[in-house]
């Protein structure tokens, strides 16, 4: 694609040739009535979304670097943002895939019909594999209708106030499309108070959104004052979160960006820990219900010690920390993936089956695969 995520994951080893899919940039089929899209891997996300919006549809991904990110790169890195709350991860909307095997042969799975589940496991396998099992060439996604109305409620305050509110909202009948906890530094960068902030977005027909916002306000305890973002403020707020975590072009070559995966019950703990390790400076956003988040460390805080301390706590909570972006010198020191599970033999067996000669993205995945 456009190489926006070539620096993600482990450092490539024994690299002889870089193959680009940037010129595989055509939309093959947009079945408006079926709400599916088939496109080549090099199609860029932002202009595609504009094209789909003409038909009141959209692809439910909000990846890093959307103005440059391609569909193939999004799938290869399983990269999506706050929309995961409502629509799931990349693999949940992928219904068909074509890829080039290590021997140059074309392989396919799934199809262009939402109900078609053939090759379901293979599509999940390719999602997030960082190109180590095949070169993605074409993809088919399910699409969703653009909602009539969108509103965002932001609540700022201490973690002690937000923690019980998050638990209450999680048990409530509310159906937000995004539900994120932001670190104080990230909140401040967005023009909010330099406190922990809970951002909740609702999208539906106008009466439905109004009702949900009103229900939410009845659940908010006295010390917290909701801020309601409407219209343009709502539309720009969420892209600003991604732009703060993944500035384009990058403003700091020494920054470290990591991905967290936690139980939802540890979301508040993770950002409290981050605040102790890097007070007032680390940018962090964690999705409240999936427990997946992103942290950006800059300047003197972008150190191996801070990353390892945060990773240690994540593992204590039953989660993980993966280094996405970091200077090469630090990646040579850090264990990028920090994987401590028991599935490595299975991953090695899959690599042996799909790429026995280690030709595809060697060294970028878990365990140096």
Task: Cite the ranges covered by each PLM segment.
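Short, conserved charged micro-motifs
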Residues: 47, 160-165, 206-214, 266-272, ...
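Structural motif
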Residues: 16-18, 35-37, 57-60, 74, ...
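Short glycine-biased active-site loop of nucleotidyltransferases that positions the nucleotide triphosphate
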Residues: 6-12, 189-192
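N-terminal glycine-rich flavin-associated loop
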Residues: 20-67, 75, 79-112, 117, ...
């Amino acid at each position: 694609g456009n190489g926006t995520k070539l620096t993600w994951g482990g450092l490539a080893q024994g690299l002889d040739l870089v193959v680009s899919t940037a010129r595989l940039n055509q939309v093959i089929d947009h079945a408006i009535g079926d709400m599916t899209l088939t496109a080549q891997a090099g199609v860029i996300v932002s202009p595609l979304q504009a094209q789909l919006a003409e038909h009141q549809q959209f692809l439910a991904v909000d990846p890093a670097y959307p103005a440059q990110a391609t569909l193939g790169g999004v799938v290869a890195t399983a990269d999506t943002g706050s929309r995961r709350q409502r629509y799931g991860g990349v693999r949940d909307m992928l219904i068909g895939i074509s890829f080039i095997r290590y021997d140059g042969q074309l392989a396919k799975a799934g199809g262009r019909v939402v109900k078609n589940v053939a090759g379901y496991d293979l599509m999940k396998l390719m999602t997030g594999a960082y190109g180590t099992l095949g070169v993605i060439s074409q993809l088919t996604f399910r699409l969703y209708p653009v909602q009539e109305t969108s509103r965002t409620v932001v609540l700022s305050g201490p973690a002690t106030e937000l923690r019980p509110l998050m638990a209450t909202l999680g048990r409530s009948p509310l159906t937000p499309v995004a539900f994120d906890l932001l670190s104080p530094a990230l909140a401040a960068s967005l023009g909010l108070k330099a406190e922990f902030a809970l951002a909740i977005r609702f999208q539906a027909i106008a009466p439905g959104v109004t009702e949900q916002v009103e229900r939410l306000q009845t659940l908010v305890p006295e010390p917290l004052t909701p801020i309601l973002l409407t219209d343009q403020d709502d539309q720009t707020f969420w892209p600003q979160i991604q732009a703060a975590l993944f500035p384009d072009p990058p403003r700091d070559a020494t920054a470290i960006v990591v991905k967290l995966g936690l139980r939802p019950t540890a979301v508040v703990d993770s950002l409290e820990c981050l605040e102790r390790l890097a007070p007032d400076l680390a940018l962090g956003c964690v999705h409240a219900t999936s427990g997946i988040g992103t942290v950006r460390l800059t300047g003197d805080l972008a150190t191996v010690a801070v990353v390892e301390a945060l990773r240690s706590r994540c593992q204590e909570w039953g989660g993980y920390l993966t280094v996405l972006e970091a200077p090469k010198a630090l990646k040579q020191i850090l264990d990028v993936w920090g994987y401590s599970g028991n599935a490595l033999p299975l991953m090695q067996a899959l690599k042996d089956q799909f790429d026995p000669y280690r030709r595809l993205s060697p060294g970028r995945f878990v365990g140096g695969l």
